[in-house]
Structure formats: C-alpha cells, structure tokens
Amino acid sequence: YMGVLRLGISHTCGLALLPEVLPKFQAEFPMVEFSLFEGNSTHLEDELAHGRVDLIVCFQPIMMEGVEVVPLTQEDLMLVVPRSFTDQIFGDRAEEMRKQFADGADIDAFQHMPFILIKRGNRTRNTVDQYFSRHFFKPKLILETENTITTLAMAEAGVGITICPELFVKT
C-alpha cells in the first residue's frame, strides 16, 4: 500500500493511542503517509461525512449511514477526584473510601464539589451528561474546556473533579 491516509482522530485518542499505534503501522506500511486532522468526535463525523478524512478514530461509536464502525476497544470513563476533596468529605475514612472507590464511586458523595468537564458537543461529554441525567445528578460546574489534558491538570491541581476516558488517565 502507498499513498496518503487522511486520518481524523479525537484529541484524547491522538494523545493516548497514536504514540503506540502509529510506529507499528508505519513499520508494516512504510509507503503510507498520514495527513492528521484532530478535533472532537462531532467535528470529525462532519469531516468524514463531507469526505475530508478517510477514517476517524474516536472513543465512542458513531451512527452514520453508509459508515462501517469497527470497535477497537471498550473504554471506561473515570471519575478523577483530587485527594484533598476525599480528605475533606470523608475525613479519617478518606483512605478507606479511596480504596473502595477503585471499584466504582457513588457520584452523589461529590454533589457539592466543583466539576471541570469537556464542553458540550463532545461525545464523552454527551455520555457524562446522560449519566448525570439518569442519576438525577446536577454537577457544580465551574469550568468547561475543549481539552481533556486541561481537565486532568485542573483535577491534579485540586481545582475540581473531572471525568475522562480511562486510557487517558493512565497516559
């Protein structure tokens, strides 16, 4: 194979997957060049629909007529909570609760804590909003951003809680 592959990829997938996958692909197909388009999943779907990219890689399935979807992996979303928040909420039981939350957290415990989320229109955000709605949870939203790295950095700095794909947290 040779030519140019116009690849659309979400920011999150690009950061988490490209460094691992691209070298292997290039080793197997050295004559293929890439033209990379990064954006949120909704924008990438539009690019695909209008023929500006050949394929897209994103975390959540797309529903477009005439498009074949090939699942590569299943990705869980993670609640990322600053340590200071669990200390504040649970006091002496904070360490015990952090261990318990490793298997899943009851989001209601964080009802009055600040949240930092990806902007609406992003598929991850759509999934998060659906979860909130099903659980009658209204987050105290203090910041929305286009960039998952920003949400993670803010959580790490103790500014707020965020939710993002598991693979991204491990990166």
Language model feature labels by segment:
Residues 87-89, 96-135:
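Secondary-structure junction motif
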Residues 40-44, 49-53, 58-59, 123-171:
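Hydrophobic hinge/microswitch elements
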Residues 56-60, 82, 118-119:
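Short beta-strand elements of ligand-binding domains
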Residues 2-65, 145:
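Central regulatory/effector-binding core of bacterial HTH transcription factors
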Residues 26, 68-71, 99, 106-108, ...:
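Short secondary-structure boundary/capping segments
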Residues 27-31, 94-103, 126, 166-171:
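C-terminal effector-binding regulatory domain of bacterial HTH transcription factors
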